[in-house]
């Protein structure tokens, strides 16, 4: 009886359909994750562009830079900011001389969603750079 049950092909279409649905759902989850990561990257590119624009215009990482950072934090989501310059004119004030390179890195820790109890961490980061537009005497 068990041998007849195992060799029976009556439920084959049902199993194929279930496997097909599971594969389709997994492909859909992957597509949604890729789309959300692309959207996150575009938003972070906008944030980094805003921050480097403020920093290069002022020629330093001052209150205007941190005010722009606070504004972006209110508009978007929590993220990490790293900043620096190739060479500082005055390192105590984080001032950068005209024509020197300044950079801002914005990063966000997130997870791949839709995998149930499995949490796969992903760090998305964007780096923008620009030249200081201020001459310091």
Roles of regions detected by a PLM:
Residues 107-137:
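Low-complexity, S/T/G/P-rich flexible repeat/linker segments used as non-globular hinges
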Residues 4-6, 92, 109, 123:
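Exposed boundary/loop context
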Residues 2-66:
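Alpha-helical assembly-interface signal, strongest on the long, hydrophobic N-terminal helix that forms
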Residues 46, 50-105:
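Short amphipathic secondary-structure patches
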């Amino acid at each position: 009886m068990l041998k007849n049950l195992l060799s029976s092909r009556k439920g084959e279409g049902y199993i194929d359909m279930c496997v097909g649905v599971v594969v389709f759902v997994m492909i859909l989850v992957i597509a949604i994750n890729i789309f959300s990561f692309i959207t996150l990257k575009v938003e972070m590119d906008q944030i980094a562009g805003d921050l480097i624009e403020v920093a290069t215009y002022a020629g330093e990482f001052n209150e205007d830079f941190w005010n722009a950072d606070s504004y972006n934090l209110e508009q978007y989501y929590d993220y990490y900011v790293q900043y620096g310059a190739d060479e500082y004119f005055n390192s105590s004030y984080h001032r950068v001389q005209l024509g020197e390179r300044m950079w801002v890195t914005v990063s966000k820790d997130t997870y791949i969603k839709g995998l149930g109890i499995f949490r796969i961490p992903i760090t998305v980061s964007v780096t923008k750079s620009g030249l200081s537009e201020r001459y310091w005497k």
